[in-house]
């Protein structure tokens, strides 16, 4: 039975629903009712719509203002970063230039030190050569003197007799007396 009631309701419903539709004839529609409804919508909806639009406008303006502030901050940070980068580049260039000049100075100092060491070694070598030359000359002189004395002694021994020996002694005694008298 219940199925039958549903069927009856359902068939009535479908007959009523079939009568709904869109009437496109403007003359048959109730323009006054529509005007009143639209007027009420505009009158009461104007405040709500105005508030919604104002809120949306304020939200958009705040978003734009925030975006502009973030853009300004980002631009400032970018400029600061560029300035720091430029300073870092300048400092790196200064360090590089100072390093190159320091390297040239060290190189020149090493060259000068090597030249001085070379000159000292040359002077030392020359002094050693002069010393060895003087020593060799002195040794030759001593040997020549020794040999000359040996020959002179041999010659004197071979030629010296007692008479010549006495004359030489007298001669040297006379020389010593002459020296003694000049001293006094």
From Swiss-Prot:
Superkingdom of origin: Eukaryota
Membrane-spanning intervals of the chain: 5-27
A Pfam family per the record: ATP-synt_B
GO molecular function: ATP binding; proton-transporting ATP synthase activity, rotational mechanism
Places the protein is found: Plastid, Chloroplast thylakoid membrane
CDD domains named in the record: ATP-synt_Fo_b (cd06503)
Keywords of the record: ATP synthesis, ATP-binding, CF(0), Chloroplast, Hydrogen ion transport, Ion transport, Membrane, Nucleotide-binding, Plastid, Thylakoid, Transmembrane, Transmembrane helix, Transport
Its membrane topology: Single-pass membrane protein
Predominant location category: plastid
InterPro entries: ATP_synth_b/b'su_bac/chlpt
Entry GO terms, CC: chloroplast thylakoid membrane; proton-transporting ATP synthase complex
Subunit structure, interactors included: F-type ATPases have 2 components, F(1) - the catalytic core - and F(0) - the membrane proton channel. F(1) has five subunits: alpha(3), beta(3), gamma(1), delta(1), epsilon(1). F(0) has four main subunits: a(1), b(1), b'(1) and c(10-14). The alpha and beta chains form an alternating ring which encloses part of the gamma chain. F(1) is attached to F(0) by a central stalk formed by the gamma and epsilon chains, while a peripheral stalk is formed by the delta, b and b' chains.
HAMAP family noted in UniProt: ATP_synth_b_bprime
PANTHER family for the chain: ATP SYNTHASE SUBUNIT B, CHLOROPLASTIC
More details: In plastids the F-type ATPase is also known as CF(1)CF(0).
Classification via NCBIfam families: PRK07352.1
Purpose of the protein: F(1)F(0) ATP synthase produces ATP from ADP in the presence of a proton or sodium gradient. F-type ATPases consist of two structural domains, F(1) containing the extramembraneous catalytic core and F(0) containing the membrane proton channel, linked together by a central stalk and a peripheral stalk. During catalysis, ATP synthesis in the catalytic domain of F(1) is coupled via a rotary mechanism of the central stalk subunits to proton translocation.
Protein family according to the UniProt entry: Belongs to the ATPase B chain family.
Protein name, UniProt field: ATP synthase subunit b, chloroplastic
The organism of origin for this protein: Marchantia polymorpha
């Amino acid at each position: 039975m219940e199925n039958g009631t549903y069927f009856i309701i359902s068939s009535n419903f479908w007959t009523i629903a079939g009568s709904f539709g869109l009437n496109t004839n403007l003359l048959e529609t109730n323009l006054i009712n529509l005007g009143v409804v639209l007027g009420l919508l505009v009158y009461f909806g104007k405040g709500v719509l105005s508030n919604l639009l104002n809120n949306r406008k304020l939200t958009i303006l705040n978003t734009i203002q925030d975006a502009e502030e973030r853009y300004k901050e980002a631009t400032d940070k970018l400029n600061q970063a560029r300035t720091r980068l430029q300073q870092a580049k300048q400092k790196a260039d200064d360090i590089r230039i100072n390093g190159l000049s320091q390297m040239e100075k060290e190189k020149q100092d090493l060259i000068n030190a090597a030249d001085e060491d070379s000159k000292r070694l040359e002077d030392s070598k020359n002094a050693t050569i002069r010393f060895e030359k003087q020593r060799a000359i002195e040794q030759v002189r001593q040997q020549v003197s020794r040999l000359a004395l040996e020959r002179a002694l041999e010659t004197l021994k071979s030629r010296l007799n007692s008479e010549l020996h006495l004359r030489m002694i007298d001669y040297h005694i006379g020389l010593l007396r002459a020296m003694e008298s000049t001293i006094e």
